Amino acid sequence: MKQPFCTPTQALRRVLDAAAALPVPATERVPLDDACGRIAARDLCARMDQPPFDRSPLDGYALHSADTAGAGEETPVTLPVVMKLYAGDAPAAALPAGCAARIMTGAPLPPGADCVLMQELTDSGEEQVRIYAQLQPNANVVFRGEDIAAGAPIAAAGTVLTPAHIGVLAGQGIPDAEVFRPLTVGVLATGSELLEAGKAWAPGKIYDANGIQNAARLRQLGFAVERTHCSDDPEEIAARMKDLLTRCDAVITSGGVSVGQKDYLPTVLEMLHAEPVFAGVAQKPGSPMIAAQVGEKLVFCLSGNPFAAAATLEQYAVPALLRAAGRREEDCIPVHTRGRLTTGFSKPSKGTRFLRARALGGLVEIPGEGNAEAHSSGSLSAMMGCNCLVELPAGSGPVAPGEEVEVLNFVQ
């Protein structure tokens, strides 16, 4: 499994390429009520013009604009009201010249009418109406297809469907959408020291936080998750991974990837005849991470240090899994922006370093008020409230408040 450490850019490219080469996920058709957050499996286009007819955007009177010539507060034009139209009505006849139609918001314009006058510029008459303003053709008309025309794209295949997509689809009379079935990810935490939350604590033991945190993040992104843990035994780890790979589309492990006497994951991957994608990334934290492929399934082996696991999950595992799940590549990658620090970081960075941070409105806060100890890869609590990583290039010195930095925003 040994390979030279790759750069973060190389590591991301390799896992995305590996994910894109996997078989396309199965699809299913779901009602729109259940489609939000799912990934469109094919291009979705408008079936009809929206709105499907010329309509009024306000309460007032539909008119022939020519009939309003010369109308003003001192020189009103009086017209007979020959019909009344509400939203949901279909005009029974065309509007004759020299007549008005009482019309409500959302109602279709009768044939012949070419403008709508708001009722505030009239006397609101029922049988006849006094017009106090002159209108141009097409005034206050929402035209057929103005929102979206028949055949126009709504969502490309690979798009995560949002409430706005759902609303537009429903407005087309489309009751459901073809989406990719969610991938199932096996999450395996390794370590003889681990206890499941709720068990009685014992000296030398710690509760498994990595496994459940990784699982929670994956569920947040729409994956189904099967979670378990096992002791530091290569045979047991291999058996658990084999079992997960029979039922899951990918596996993520935490712990056991470094060079300690009980870091067995490299050996286990060899036992499983895994093909390496990369083994090690030139960054801190998370440098020992391994990405591999067993058959047509991806395996990501993360550090057991909580922040290292969380950072590399976001940087490499999440983008690759989203790509494998059917998302468009551009929607799988953490978005890079620039931000100005409100707090600093007091330590130089010999190699590429990533810090947990919170970005809002172009400002970036690094937790711990510049205290490097708060950014230990073993610290879990400092992740709370963070929504991004700050990248400090190799050879960087300490950074101070007010400096501009590169920000990797977590994928949503």
Predicted regions mapped to residue ranges:
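Flexible glycine/proline-rich
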Residues: 9, 28-33, 42, 88, ...
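Helix-rich terminal scaffold detector
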Residues: 1-9, 175-302, 306-312
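Short, hydrophobic/aliphatic alpha-helical segments
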Residues: 35-49, 90-102, 149, 291-292, ...
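Short, glycine/charged-enriched hinge/interface segments at domain edges or termini
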Residues: 2-3, 8, 62-228, 373-374, ...
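Short beta-strand/loop turn elements enriched in aromatics
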Residues: 27-32, 53-79, 112-127, 327, ...
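Residue-level signal for inorganic ion chemistry
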Residues: 15, 60, 151, 187, ...
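Short, low-complexity N-terminal leaders and the immediately following helix N-cap/first helix
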Residues: 1-73, 327-354
